[in-house]
Regions:
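NTP-dependent nucleotidyl-transfer catalytic core
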Residues: 2-257
């Protein structure tokens, strides 16, 4: 697109605001309960968090992910940590910033070796401030409704060849999820750039998710009808068993290696 003379802005869009962060925070808490950032009286102006590194985070995340599938109490702890982070708990915000610092430095190092760069290093967290506006739009347009404690929006069409489930915009515990931040990000991008096209270059397995998100965005008129929302899927790196690598499952060769 850029080679054809178009003005193009690239954004890495980090997954830095969901359960994966809550899992890491919960596991670090279990291993290091004495860290000041886990105290209710953490003061960001006076207190600090320990310095982390990429090797530690690469070990903690898959460990915590596996643990959450076997331990319901830990899974609930991770959900609570996610909720508290998204609601501004000071110690968690400070720890999150350290996790982000380490992660971005590691990503930039790898991308540099591949000759890849981005104009923006935004994450889901950058769209967080647009979520209240998103929820109000969905409510004012009578698009959102409660289902089993969660808030959802119908996106099915009469000519769908396969079932199209509603998109969940708020979980039953009132926390935001992937779709919430993706919809809020559409508001952000339209506000910042007023683009003619927004392309999502992501894993093929995300196609259903983005179909739901795009349909919801259209129903809510988050972008003008003239703005194209397009999913550009790519394949996966698979292991010897033929199954895609999953960072959260562990045992995956790091790109830097």
């Amino acid at each position: 697109a850029r080679a054809c003379g178009n003005t193009v802005y690239s954004d890495v869009h980090l997954g830095d605001w969901g359960l994966q962060i809550g899992l890491v925070i919960a596991e670090l808490n279990e291993r290091n309960p004495g860290w000041k950032c886990f105290s209710e009286d953490f003061d960001p102006d006076k207190d600090s968090v320990p310095e982390l590194n990429a090797d530690l985070l690469s070990e903690v995340y898959p460990f915590a992910s596996k643990k959450s599938k076997e331990d319901e109490a830990f899974k609930e702890k991770a959900h609570i940590a996610t909720f508290d982070l998204q609601n501004g708990r000071a110690g968690y915000i400070a720890l999150w910033k350290e996790i982000l610092r380490v992660s971005i430095a590691d990503l930039k190092s790898n991308y540099s070796k591949l000759g890849v760069d981005f104009d923006y290093w935004y994450g889901e967290s950058d769209a967080d401030k647009y979520i209240p506006e998103l929820m109000k739009i969905l409510e004012d347009k009578h698009l959102s409704y409660e289902s089993d404690g969660a808030l959802v929006v119908d996106v099915a069409k009469e000519d769908d060849k396969a079932p199209m489930p509603p998109v969940i915009v708020r979980k039953s515990d009132n926390s935001s999820i992937y779709a919430t931040t993706d919809l809020a990000t559409i508001i952000q991008r339209n506000r910042d750039f007023a683009p003619d096209r927004i392309w999502y270059v992501v894993d093929n397995r995300q196609e259903l998710h983005f179909t739901q998100v795009f349909r919801c965005a259209r129903r809510a008129q988050l972008v003008p009808d003239s703005t194209d929302l397009e999913f550009l899927g790519f394949g996966t790196m698979n292991g010897t068993d033929g199954k895609p690598y999953k960072t959260r499952d562990g045992g995956v060769m790091r790109l830097s290696d």
